[in-house]
Amino acid sequence: MSIQSEQDFFKFEELCKDFYLKPEETIKIDDILHQYFLNPNFLIEYKQILSFTKNSYVVAQVIRGLIKCVTSFWTSLTPNQKNDMSKSIEHHCIGLRILKDIISEFNEYIGEHLTVLQHRNISISLRDNILLDIFCISLESLNYALANSMDEKFKSIKELALDLSYSCLSFDFIKTTSIDSSEEILTVQIPSQWKSTFDENNPLELFFKIYKQYHSTKSLECILQIVSIRRSFFTTEDERVKFLASIVQYTTEILKSNIGFNEPNNHLVFSRVIERLKTNYHLNNLVTVVGYNDWISNLSTFTIDTLKNPQFSPNSIYFLLTLWAKLVSSIIYVKGDPSKTYLEKYSPIIMESFINSKIDNSYSDEEDEHLMDYEKMVEILEGIPHLGRITYQATCRQIILLFDSISSKFLNETNPTQLEVYERQCAWLVYIIGCLILGRTSINSSEEHDKIDGELSVRVFILIGYNDKKLSAESNTQYQYRTSRISLELSFIYFMQNFRRIYIGENSISSSKIYQRISELSGPTDHTSVLFSIVQKIGFNFKYWAENDEIIKKSLDMFWESVNGHSTSKMLIDNKITKDILKTHSSQVFPFLEKNSNPRNRTSLYKTIGKLLFTDENMGFFDEFIAPFDDTIKHLLNISTPEQFRTEEIKRKVIGLLRDLRGIITSANSKRSYLLFFEWIHLNFSEVLIKIINVWVDSPEVTTSLLKFISEFVFNRQSRLIFDSSSANGFIIFRDTSKILVSYASLILKANISKQDLYKFKIKGIQTSMLLFTRCLVGGYCNFGVFELYGDPSFTSAIDYIFQLCLSVSLDELMSFPKASKAYVTMLEALCLGHTLSIIQLNQQYFIHIMKSLHRCLDSQDVTMSSSSCTSIEKIITVCYYHLKKKNSQCLQAIHQNFFSNSNILYEIIDKIISIIIYEDNFNQFMFSKLLLTCIIFHQDTFTTLKQKYIHSFNSQCPEKVEKAFVQLMENTLDNLETKNKDKFTSNVSIFRKEMKLISSSTGRYL
């Protein structure tokens, strides 16, 4: 569609308005607008449109249209079209917005008007040919705005030019960032060709100048990107030193004047700039810079002011503490006298200020938010060990004075408001002690430091004991809802975890001085008694914090790590506490089994208990341990009607049973332990599970728990399912699994499920079904051919219903969920490698669906998925190739029906492989080379047709070059699939790829 008249324009304007004002027609209008945008003439028409109107709806759609049009027809643009911007302020602003949005479109894959491969290559084209010019335009616009800074009209140019500069500097230059990645790139890989522009225009100075004048956050973000530029961008050491000196000079000026820090965002971004400076440059480089002394002094003042002022973001504190930690940890690498770093002078002051700030801030209720954000808070603490241990004795004195005073007041306080303050203060001190303990290494440790650790640790252990005694005496459970109290408990867990890691078990650092000091202060103590006290504390939490999910989860994590450690497990295996748990593990012992709302915690608990059970010392307790589960299964089987079975009480019991059993079987990692569990459950295995499915198939909470349990049950972890040659156990396991799978699939296929509930009620179940079926296929404990031999439909029924499940949702829906798509491709690979003939002989609907799925995954950004697809397709075609040579092969009819009657399948596969080889970088070249040769030898005519397509699709100037590249591709290759032939072809593919890339770049072909 095109705009040729005034009437056409009014029609276009009306569409732009309706796009925003009539949401019910948005999709229909969007399709119409796309017909305008994807017409190359739109690159000329947009000027006429903008001359007619300044309507914001039209301007927004014009910008959107230019993005689509330019990204689709970039190679057709003339230089004038690429650089055209009106000299008026309004059109200047529109031009800057267009350029910024074009960069975003090139940098981020959004929409479907280009494939991933096309988008990637056109993005590289922009980077190599025009991005530097756009960056120069942004710098010119900034200078233009600064020259007219007194005129308010130029403010918008300045802001838009800063946005454009940031878009240029934050471009994914090496195209390695995942589409879904949220991780920040710490090093900016600006091309070397930009060096002259940096030398001539000095953008660093420009952005600092703008910040000083306008206090612009965006200018600081641009500075952050420049500070992050790779060091190799500067060709000589003198240039690097000069650049570093400039940063130190400019940042020192801002540190002295505190320019713009009344704006929190400025303070945060500036903190990131300072931290990134140390990330990219060594302390050795910093200390040699003129002005370092002034810089480190002002940085210390800035950090202390930040710690004292609660208005600043915790993220600012995190970046500053990280910076100081990096500086301190680098002292050992400094050449010459380390005192020239001044870190021993300033670091203790920073540490003292941090501790005092947390104590002072605890008077505010807002501190609960920081303490309850466990992950962020622990992240902030990561830098504390370096700061605290540089002058450990001074740090210890400060902590002990505060701890003794506050803990004494806390234990005697009755006023609820004041009690909350003391709880927050104690929590922070315990967290700080915990992170200081964790910071002990073989490098920074000494006997004196170990004694200090003992001084600090004994106070925490005593506080834990007094606190638990106080809590158990409370008549009500309101403490479970007090955030300050929860924070204190989480700090205890954090401390105990760190103490266990450093001073107990195989990863601990040997030291007798800490236990000697603890014994002096609190009575005889060693690592075993401390471990038991930790386990007792875990048990206390299970009882008194049953309703708090976070405390229970972290207590379970600590329990698991204690049981799973080689040395700590030996201490725990053969003792009275363990024996009591194995004999009695009901909700009376672990109240959270009934009271906690998170059923995952049940699995974690029984995984840990199972680890204790399945040892030589404790396996004799199995019958006594498993008896409660046996009673539950018998109770479920004895319920006679579906109505009686379908109650909330039974539902909770079923979910609990399945999650508990999954935890137990997860820890049965030996043949002996697995066989013990199998012999107990297999008699009632399929009967009880099928009964559960029949009644609760519409409840994803039940079916997910059931399918995940089976998935773990059939998982041949550590070869635990390899039975004796005389045993039929492997066949029994798969036969029962097939029954359950077929029952689930047949019922869920009949269910009417809405689009919004599709993942929860169906796709998640399909995903787990595929996972458990894959584990059966690759387990190696069952010969599936036996089923067909004896007329048992277990295997064929499982395959049939698995593909019915896959076909019951669209491929787009299945592939839109990463876990489901990965499970699907993994299952297809297992089937194609182990049961190729079964795949080839499937009905046409299933076979085409499989091939389309594998074709789609060939260009997946996940190399594992693309490689699996390659392997699967190659195996199918290889088997077909060899069977075609056998005139009496039974599967000839299936090959002709599935392959040759659908010739476009092979055509599309070869086409995509060639395209990936030419244009893509993120792929396994050896896998794709093998697959391409297999396809070519299997069907030469299809390859010949595609070769002609590629020859004609390039410019008329170079068809002979393309043809020559294809001739070289097949040079010295033979008509066979032997390894030697594949290796030769792989070498040819490397040459072919190189030649085709050169041809592509010379002709400007990126699509």
UniProtKB/Swiss-Prot annotation:
<protein>
    <recommendedName>
        <fullName>Exportin-7</fullName>
    </recommendedName>
</protein>
<dbReference type="GO" id="GO:0005737">
    <property type="term" value="C:cytoplasm"/>
</dbReference>
<keyword id="KW-0509">mRNA transport</keyword>
<keyword id="KW-0963">Cytoplasm</keyword>
<comment type="function">
    <text>Mediates the nuclear export of proteins (cargos) with broad substrate specificity.</text>
</comment>
<keyword id="KW-0811">Translocation</keyword>
<dbReference type="GO" id="GO:0005634">
    <property type="term" value="C:nucleus"/>
</dbReference>
<keyword id="KW-0539">Nucleus</keyword>
<comment type="similarity">
    <text>Belongs to the exportin family.</text>
</comment>
<dbReference type="InterPro" id="IPR044189">
    <property type="entry name" value="XPO4/7-like"/>
</dbReference>
<dbReference type="GO" id="GO:0005643">
    <property type="term" value="C:nuclear pore"/>
</dbReference>
<dbReference type="InterPro" id="IPR016024">
    <property type="entry name" value="ARM-type_fold"/>
</dbReference>
<dbReference type="GO" id="GO:0006611">
    <property type="term" value="P:protein export from nucleus"/>
</dbReference>
<dbReference type="GO" id="GO:0005049">
    <property type="term" value="F:nuclear export signal receptor activity"/>
</dbReference>
<dbReference type="GO" id="GO:0051028">
    <property type="term" value="P:mRNA transport"/>
</dbReference>
<keyword id="KW-0653">Protein transport</keyword>
<keyword id="KW-0813">Transport</keyword>
<keyword id="KW-0906">Nuclear pore complex</keyword>
